Amino acid sequence: AVIYPPADDIFNAMHFTPLSQVKVLILGQDPYHNENQAHGLSFSVLPSQKDIPPSLQNIYQELHDDLGCKVPNNGYLKKWADQGVLLLNTVLTVRAHQANSHQGHGWEQFTDAIIEAVNAQDRPIVYMLWGRPAQSKIPMLTNPKHLILKAPHPSPLSAYRGFFGCRHFSQANEFLKKNGIE
């Protein structure tokens, strides 16, 4: 069976955004399951992909509406990761063309440990939790220095139920700025 992302990319979220650098954690579910899309960062696709996935289009739309950012012409979010945004999925692999096919096979324990390590950081961090699966992690997030932002998932199925207009990006910026983090 073909598995995505390629083996060398599975842990990219942690490589690109080491624990000491995390300012924001955006929690996704599982990787994109078509070829040449997933590369280890939630919501992100490789720069060679001409099509920006619908959820990411909606994230860009909210970013534009909230902060006036220009909508990029690709879906490659490595720049976010390099700036301290941990783009973590709760499950890190998927069988080709089968969404959620690797749920319940052990990745959740691993990614929960990452979430717990972020929760233990004694500095301000923002969590953006979009959709119920991401929000199911809230009981693990006990650090009073951290900001938890919740909204429906940016998928076209739920974006109009409150993802659009959630203003998470400006709230995160204000919180980090207030705490002296650029």
Enumerate the predicted regions with their spans:
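Charged phosphate-binding loop/patch that engages nucleotide di/tri-phosphates or the phosphate backbone
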Residues: K178-E182
